[in-house]
Amino acid sequence: MTTVIENDSQKSGRLEVGTPLLEVKDLHVEFHTRDGVAKAVNGVNYSVAAGETLAVLGESGSGKSVTAQTIMGILDMPPGKVTQGEILYRGQDMLKMSNEERRKIRGRKIAMIFQDALSALNPVLSVGYQLGEMFRVHQGVSKAEAKAKAIELMDRVRIPAAKERVNDYPHQFSGGMRQRIMIAMALSLQPDLIIADEPTTALDVTVQAQVMDLLAELQAEYNMGLILITHDLGVVADVADKIAVMYEGRRGEGGPVADNYKHPAHPHTRRLLDS
């Protein structure tokens, strides 16, 4: 059993230069089904530091989203089960934390942007109510204060006429605007790390670029770590510092983006480049 001792930088909330914000170490996740055991993640390792962007690449079924859901603590268990490994946030293994400890990290310290904003947002609640809920739950502010903060967030992610649109519902926004609402929701409590799971898949090329530029700008402003999950190498070429290529639940290769573009070692990476 590993004993973790907090140092002064952890107590103060600061990390030493070069210290990973999040580390995934030898992670194994499997699903128990009627047909047997399906191994979804097989010994994945990667890390991300404050202000750094890690792109996790892979096709459907590669295990990239299962890894992200395990980090967030939102994977259904059962049927899912972590059989081995560590997920270290600021040196603390989240897999050994209680549900209450994980809940305090989720949203406050590590937030997630989901692929399908329309499904992730509640269709019967206004976007202002959903944005404000983060402040009401975690900060105990009044409804009026929560609404004001929601408008500020909508302005921050450049949703036009935020004050007039705060009471609108998700279906009244375009796909690009809904994704901006998801970004605003993730940013609401100024987390250390954001995990963006295919955040631009359903958007056209122009809107994709706008969303990625916005994410990069906000990341730099708040010095957040960013894990960008995607199957599209073109999306990450200009924003990622390093990549981790996943294939059949394993990390095929990784490292600085430029090195992997110029000298891809794994066949799957070459296929992604050619696609």
PLM regions with names:
Residues 1-274:
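ABC transporter nucleotide-binding domains
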